[in-house]
From Swiss-Prot:
Entry GO CC: cytoplasm
GO molecular function, one term: phosphoribosyl-ATP diphosphatase activity
CDD domains per the UniProt record, alphabetical: NTP-PPase_HisIE_like
Family classification: Belongs to the PRA-PH family.
Record's subcellular location: Cytoplasm
Pfam entry (one): PRA-PH
Gene: hisE
GO biological process, one term: L-histidine biosynthetic process
Region (Disordered): 88-108
Organism (species): Paracoccus denitrificans (strain Pd 1222)
Lineage per the UniProt record: Bacteria, Pseudomonadati, Pseudomonadota, Alphaproteobacteria, Rhodobacterales
Designated name of the protein: Phosphoribosyl-ATP pyrophosphatase
Length: 108
């Protein structure tokens, strides 16, 4: 969590985590998670492609909507593999201050 006032992404991640054990009949998130990590990854990919299409088209409102869907599905996919938003933030913190070229070279 991010301090005393969690961001919207942290609140969403907390909601997704709470729905992991919920009834798939009453929660879309629980239903998606019950289908397994592969289905969650597939949905993330679909939403990412839709965001890319809207970015190319230049429709700002649709891009914002698709970006929100993409972030939701990214968090669901991460939750399906027990990866938290904090885990990802820690990785970003680790990379902070390094050039992208230097960081990418260190992964080879």
């Amino acid at each position: 969590m991010s301090g005393p006032h969690p961001t919207g992404l942290h609140r969403l991640a907390e909601t997704i985590a709470a729905r992991k054990g919920a009834d798939p009949e009453t929660s879309w998130t629980a239903k998606l998670l019950a289908k397994g990590p592969e289905k969650c990854a597939e949905k993330f990919g679909e939403e990412a492609v839709e965001a890319i299409i809207e970015a190319v088209k230049g429709d700002r409102a649709k891009l914002i909507s698709e970006a929100a869907d993409t972030l939701y599905h990214l968090l669901v996919m991460l939750a399906a593999r027990d990866v938290t938003l904090s885990d990802v933030e820690n990785e970003l913190d680790r990379r902070e201050g390094r050039s992208g070229i230097e960081e990418k070279a260190s992964r080879k």
